[in-house]
Curated annotation (Swiss-Prot):
Xref: Pfam families: Ribosomal_L36 (PF00444)
UniProt source species: Synechocystis sp. (strain ATCC 27184 / PCC 6803 / Kazusa)
Biological process annotations from GO: translation
Keywords: Ribonucleoprotein, Ribosomal protein
PROSITE patterns given in the database record: RIBOSOMAL_L36
Record HAMAP family: Ribosomal_bL36 (MF_00251)
Family of the protein in this entry: Belongs to the bacterial ribosomal protein bL36 family.
Protein name as it appears in the record: Large ribosomal subunit protein bL36
GO molecular function: structural constituent of ribosome
Cellular component annotations (GO), alphabetically ordered: cytoplasm; ribonucleoprotein complex; ribosome
InterPro entries: Ribosomal_bL36, Ribosomal_bL36_sp
Amino acid sequence: MKVRASVKKMCDKCRVIRRRGRVMVICSANPKHKQRQG
């Protein structure tokens, strides 16, 4: 899980979602692409 000021999709399998007011990126293809904003 990377914590970043700005989260972006790293591949076409990445999905941007909101959980508990936080913007997150989850990826089924590559778990290294997981990110959280803040």
